[in-house]
Amino acid sequence: MSRLIVKNLPNGMKEERFRQLFAAFGTLTDCSLKFTKDGKFRKFGFIGFKSEEEAQAALNHFHRSFIDTTRITVEFCKSFGDPSKPRAWSKHAQKSSQPKQPSQDSVPSDTKKDKKKKGPSDLEKLKEDAKFQEFLSIHQKRTQVATWANDALEAKLPKAKTKASSDYLNFDSDSNSDSGQESEEEPAREDPEEEQGLQPKAAVQKELSDMDYLKSKMVRAEVSSEDEDEEDSEDEAVNCEEGSEEEEEEGSPASPAKQGGVSRGAVPGVLRPQEAAGKVEKPVSQKEPTTPYTVKLRGAPFNVTEKNVIEFLAPLKPVAIRIVRNAHGNKTGYVFVDLSSEEEVKKALKCNRDYMGGRYIEVFREKQAPTARGPPKSTTPWQGRTLGENEEEEDLADSGRLFVRNLSYTSSEEDLEKLFSAYGPLSELHYPIDSLTKKPKGFAFVTFMFPEHAVKAYAEVDGQVFQGRMLHVLPSTIKKEASQEANAPGSSYKKKKEAMDKANSSSSHNWNTLFMGPNAVADAIAQKYNATKSQVFDHETRGSVAVRVALGETQLVQEVRSFLIDNGVCLDSFSQAAAERSKTVILAKNLPAGTLAAEIQETFSRFGSLGRVLLPEGGITAIVEFLEPLEARKAFRHLAYSKFHHVPLYLEWAPIGVFGAAPQKKDSQHEQPAEKAEVEQETVLDPEGEKASVEGAEASTGKMEEEEEEEEEEEEESIPGCTLFIKNLNFSTTEETLKGVFSKVGAIKSCTISKKKNKAGVLLSMGFGFVEYKKPEQAQKALKQLQGHTVDGHKLEVRISERATKPALTSTRKKQVPKKQTTSKILVRNIPFQANQREIRELFSTFGELKTVRLPKKMTGTGAHRGFGFVDFITKQDAKKAFNALCHSTHLYGRRLVLEWADSEVTVQTLRRKTARHFQEPPKKKRSAVLDGILEQLEDEDNSDGEQALQL
């Protein structure tokens, strides 16, 4: 835990001083003091460190220490939702939503406090008591009751008046909804005693003048006339509906006219509680739009229902239907329909000028909903966010995408990847940074490969402390698929192909590190040897044009490799296709010949800050390094397969570790210009226009060959008698210790200790191992000198092993394991079918004299070859020279040649030996018999050792 809570701080504590106190113990990621809503300091605060060690050091130093004259308490924070977290007792803390259970030790109910609380409930009961209402009517003030009024008749007059008013309203109304509404309001007015006791009638109020009484009667007539006018005009009805809904939402008092229409005869400006409760409120779905895709129907019948609207828009499925009513509940002929997408809106607009129940319907797009006031304000501002144009909402169990906020500004992508990769493999991690300061913005998007892993991470990471800050994890929206636009009916094949290539640009199946286009190769070769491009592609000259271009590409590749090595690039990282890729280094390929480094820098610098930009002399392949991973991804996404000059730009993520240490400059640099001059003299085009690419290819590989020949040692097959079997090893002995003991005798080829997994999956030593020497003489010497030697308290038992050493445990991930050269024969795969044996011979004869070239054909023996062949050189040195030159990136007719070392030939003697072993070896024993034999052999050895000890 790297987050601390500091309690009992002094009143005068400021955030700057609070930060300075803890800044000496490490990097602070959060510092906050807590205040009430009124600005009063609550005497505690939170401090966050980047690591747990820094937080622990600060806790040990400040816990129970003094700041000014107050002793503070420093503790580790608890994660959100931790069951061991104490319950909040402060009045400022958020109260729990669970209902409180009544305690048994409650205060007696006859206290004054309880009497005050029970007063309103008792008064409600007295309102229903007829005798109490009669008591109130008798004891009214004489100024409020006429002296000639009959107390016995007052209870009947309100009921008769209510009935008359109801009849009058029913007679005046044309809508069935009004009668239904009045029927709901009638029970609220059937309490004459309540009317008599609480609110006297307007006719008997002495302080009410005659003019005011007449005005109250005139209001009712104006409302009825307004009803008729609003039914005639549809536009005014919509406006009235908007105004009425706004007043209901704001809760503002109604105008006298509307009060008169609602109270049905009550005193103006007074609305009884029973009538307010009986008033029918519209549901929220009729007031506010639920989606931003809304259409408006005009001219709908006044008896329209939601079912009619659904049938009218079939087969669309509306999200919500809002039938507009005026202030009195009458339908106005306007209907607002909320749809789920823009496509459904376009389909709904096609229903314009159709008929619904004999009425002509007009359909419009409603850009701004009439009754929408925006999403309701919530205490959580991240909720209720309107989706963007390129976003769509999807369940977390389907998308697997999380939105992580409140991240530390000192955290990095590696930290987040380490945190979330513990729950499952990640497919994408987007951590935005500020374009000016290059610092994180404090939030990130994490996409898991499997959505169930995202659900697990969402449940466990939300509320956890990460680098001193409490994380807040939410399900994220997902981006709309851009491929839908490319697959539109009107899209051309070219656009579809470009969209598909751009979508698959980061896939590893199309990665070729040193790819060079044939057109760029021809331009570079022609420029280098002062020739024209037509001379390079001249098919009338001697030799194949495809072979000529392939040899030119091989020469350029060798020059590029030499340039990269001189600039500190580790070429070994390019050998593994399955190696992990960098997040900041990009390989830019398929560049036109003569490209300048300034052009590459200008193209890529638009997306962020660049580090190193390497461009060889030919200008065909470049390496671009970004300082921030986010900017590198942005550049890769925008520039992949984009047009650069007149060719598409191919991008590839470089392997990790591509930039190594800068190599030391050799003393033979002064010899390079002379060698280069000799190469140029040998590679001048002849009068017929043929390029002497043979000498150029040999000279370009000379430097690489010399370095490899110095370290080259003929690796032969394992010779019998070179491997030792060591028993009685200590279980704690490691391979390094064992190798150090046996390496004193001679050069060790390999050293392994056999291990097995226990139930927990941990590899444990089995007590024996194998040591393989390069020569049998060294193994015999070690057998004599180290027999009985003590290692980690155990005497070793050494003998010659009769079998090969066990292979080391390898990962399940497939990697390219190059075969060792055992013969002078090379297996060539991916040969184009239009290539013939003469062209293959011409290509490989550049590097040495050939013995045979064979292209196997199908079983019939006719037709084209099968796409692979065997090239056998006379010497192994020539074979290795050709292999090192052509294995990197050589294309023949546009197909890359894949080279492997062929297996050694099976001779007649080998076949005879194998056949004899098959017939002479005894049948295999059962496993139990083999184990018994091993145990007997061990017992015999122990007995013989005991006899030798007795003799001594």
Swiss-Prot record:
<dbReference type="GO" id="GO:0003723">
    <property type="term" value="F:RNA binding"/>
</dbReference>
<feature type="domain" description="RRM 3">
    <location>
        <begin position="400"/>
        <end position="478"/>
    </location>
</feature>
<feature type="compositionally biased region" description="Acidic residues">
    <location>
        <begin position="224"/>
        <end position="251"/>
    </location>
</feature>
<feature type="cross-link" description="Glycyl lysine isopeptide (Lys-Gly) (interchain with G-Cter in SUMO2)">
    <location>
        <position position="479"/>
    </location>
</feature>
<feature type="compositionally biased region" description="Acidic residues">
    <location>
        <begin position="181"/>
        <end position="196"/>
    </location>
</feature>
<dbReference type="GO" id="GO:0040019">
    <property type="term" value="P:positive regulation of embryonic development"/>
</dbReference>
<protein>
    <recommendedName>
        <fullName>Probable RNA-binding protein 19</fullName>
    </recommendedName>
</protein>
<keyword id="KW-0963">Cytoplasm</keyword>
<feature type="modified residue" description="Phosphoserine">
    <location>
        <position position="177"/>
    </location>
</feature>
<comment type="function">
    <text>Plays a role in embryo pre-implantation development.</text>
</comment>
<feature type="region of interest" description="Disordered">
    <location>
        <begin position="159"/>
        <end position="267"/>
    </location>
</feature>
<feature type="domain" description="RRM 6">
    <location>
        <begin position="824"/>
        <end position="904"/>
    </location>
</feature>
<feature type="domain" description="RRM 4">
    <location>
        <begin position="584"/>
        <end position="656"/>
    </location>
</feature>
<dbReference type="GO" id="GO:0005694">
    <property type="term" value="C:chromosome"/>
</dbReference>
<keyword id="KW-0539">Nucleus</keyword>
<feature type="compositionally biased region" description="Basic and acidic residues">
    <location>
        <begin position="664"/>
        <end position="679"/>
    </location>
</feature>
<feature type="domain" description="RRM 5">
    <location>
        <begin position="722"/>
        <end position="803"/>
    </location>
</feature>
<dbReference type="InterPro" id="IPR034423">
    <property type="entry name" value="RBM19_RRM5"/>
</dbReference>
<dbReference type="InterPro" id="IPR034420">
    <property type="entry name" value="RBM19_RRM4"/>
</dbReference>
<dbReference type="InterPro" id="IPR051945">
    <property type="entry name" value="RRM_MRD1_RNA_proc_ribogen"/>
</dbReference>
<keyword id="KW-0158">Chromosome</keyword>
<dbReference type="InterPro" id="IPR012677">
    <property type="entry name" value="Nucleotide-bd_a/b_plait_sf"/>
</dbReference>
<dbReference type="InterPro" id="IPR034417">
    <property type="entry name" value="RMB19_RRM2"/>
</dbReference>
<dbReference type="GO" id="GO:0005730">
    <property type="term" value="C:nucleolus"/>
</dbReference>
<feature type="domain" description="RRM 1">
    <location>
        <begin position="2"/>
        <end position="79"/>
    </location>
</feature>
<feature type="compositionally biased region" description="Polar residues">
    <location>
        <begin position="163"/>
        <end position="180"/>
    </location>
</feature>
<feature type="region of interest" description="Disordered">
    <location>
        <begin position="85"/>
        <end position="126"/>
    </location>
</feature>
<feature type="compositionally biased region" description="Acidic residues">
    <location>
        <begin position="705"/>
        <end position="718"/>
    </location>
</feature>
<feature type="modified residue" description="Phosphoserine">
    <location>
        <position position="693"/>
    </location>
</feature>
<keyword id="KW-0217">Developmental protein</keyword>
<keyword id="KW-0694">RNA-binding</keyword>
<feature type="modified residue" description="Phosphoserine">
    <location>
        <position position="944"/>
    </location>
</feature>
<dbReference type="Pfam" id="PF00076">
    <property type="entry name" value="RRM_1"/>
</dbReference>
<feature type="region of interest" description="Disordered">
    <location>
        <begin position="481"/>
        <end position="504"/>
    </location>
</feature>
<dbReference type="InterPro" id="IPR034421">
    <property type="entry name" value="RBM19_RRM6"/>
</dbReference>
<dbReference type="GO" id="GO:0005654">
    <property type="term" value="C:nucleoplasm"/>
</dbReference>
<keyword id="KW-0597">Phosphoprotein</keyword>
<feature type="modified residue" description="Phosphoserine">
    <location>
        <position position="179"/>
    </location>
</feature>
<dbReference type="InterPro" id="IPR000504">
    <property type="entry name" value="RRM_dom"/>
</dbReference>
<feature type="modified residue" description="Phosphoserine">
    <location>
        <position position="928"/>
    </location>
</feature>
<dbReference type="InterPro" id="IPR034419">
    <property type="entry name" value="RBM19_RRM3"/>
</dbReference>
<dbReference type="GO" id="GO:0005737">
    <property type="term" value="C:cytoplasm"/>
</dbReference>
